[in-house]
Design a protein with these regions (language model features):
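N-terminal signal-anchor/first transmembrane alpha helix
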Residues: 1-12
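Periplasmic/extracellular loop-to-transmembrane helix junction in inner-membrane transport proteins
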Residues: 14-56
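Hydrophobic alpha-helical elements at and bordering transmembrane segments
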Residues: 32, 39-43, 47, 77-84, ...
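Transmembrane-helix boundary motif in ABC transporter permease subunits
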Residues: 52-82, 99
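Generic hydrophobic transmembrane alpha-helix motif, especially the helices
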Residues: 83-119, 126-127
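Glycine-rich helix-loop "coupling/hinge" segments at transmembrane-helix boundaries
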Residues: 99-100, 128, 175-189
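Transmembrane alpha-helices
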Residues: 110, 114, 147-180
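Short helix-to-coil transition segments within interhelical loops
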Residues: 128-158
């Protein structure tokens, strides 16, 4: 990578490429260091949108997944809506959310929630359903209630699935925050 930066610097200077078109790495790093306060302030805004949106998305997704898991009839009506919600590009919803909620942090957090909600709920619900049936039968034979089975077997078993959904959602939440800021924001990356 260091060699690429040196090559880039030499070629830009040797070919007299305009700085506005392709600035040399030395100029980029110089600007980064001289503007670190501004960049850090904007980073904090984006970071706040991502973290708050991701936490709210996880809380909402876990609660809806639990409701769907316990009420099987709801799965037939809610799950298709969840899948259909993923067909709408978030970038088309961004201007609407901006108009409805204003150009503040709330509209960006809602975009993050929308974009990161689906992988969390799908993975957590899959984890709840994937518990070995033999383990559940054995727990019932030992006298465990449905609530005990849920909290002591199914939730811990679904934790790796939840973490997998959070990994996917954490990447997409950054994309959601940046898209929201791109459509309309006064601060953020």
């Amino acid at each position: 990578i260091f060699i690429l930066f040196i090559l880039w610097e030499v070629l830009v200077r040797a070919l007299n490429v305009e700085e506005w078109f392709l600035p040399p790495p030395s100029l980029i790093f110089n600007e980064l260091f001289s503007s670190y306060k501004i960049i850090f302030d904007h980073f904090l805004t984006t970071f706040t949108e991502v973290v708050v949106g991701l936490i709210l998305s996880a809380v909402i997704a876990i609660n809806i997944a639990i409701v769907i898991f316990f009420f099987k009839n709801l799965e037939k009506s809610i799950y298709p809506l969840l899948i259909a919600s993923q067909t709408i590009p978030v970038i088309t919803l961004s201007p609407l959310l901006l108009v409805w909620f204003g150009p503040n942090i709330l509209s960006k957090i809602i975009i993050v929630i929308i974009i990161s909600f689906f992988p969390i709920i799908v993975n957590f619900l899959d984890g709840l359903k994937s518990v070995d049936a033999e383990m559940i039968k054995m727990s019932e034979q030992f006298g465990a209630s449905k609530l005990q089975i849920f909290y002591k077997i199914q939730v811990p078993y679904s934790f790796p699935y939840f973490i997998s959904g959070m990994k996917i959602a954490s990447v997409s939440s950054v994309i959601g925050a940046v898209v929201g800021e791109w459509v309309g924001a006064s601060s953020g990356l």
